[in-house]
Amino acid sequence: MARMVQCIKLNKEAEGMDFAPLPGELGKKIWNQVSKEAWAAWLKQQTMLINENRLNMADPRARQYLLKQVEKYFFEGGADMAQGYVPEAE
């Protein structure tokens, strides 16, 4: 049976992740409050930020930037968008 969470991003009960995606308190908070579906959406957002901003993941500043963005994405109303990004029409 899948673990269910009340997803803070989707505002509904959904399947939770199997393990914390990040270490520390932020990882625990995400594991408890974010669904697999919402995490997959974040990974797409993160990929756009890395590519559009040409982030070097070996640079500690780039990793810190993404940690701040993931926290903003789920818990503070939204992360930065890639410049020029236009969401697909539904």
Curated annotation (Swiss-Prot):
State a single Gene Ontology molecular function: iron ion binding
A cellular-component GO term for this protein: cytosol
Q: Which UniProt keywords apply?
A: Iron
A Pfam family annotated for this chain is Iron_traffic
GO biological process terms, alphabetically, are: cellular response to oxidative stress
Signal peptide interval: none
Origin, by domain of life? Bacteria
Q: Does the keyword Iron apply?
A: yes
Give the similarity note. Belongs to the Fe(2+)-trafficking protein family.
So what does this one do?
Could be a mediator in iron transactions between iron acquisition and iron-requiring processes, such as synthesis and/or repair of Fe-S clusters in biosynthetic enzymes.
Please give the name of this protein.
Probable Fe(2+)-trafficking protein
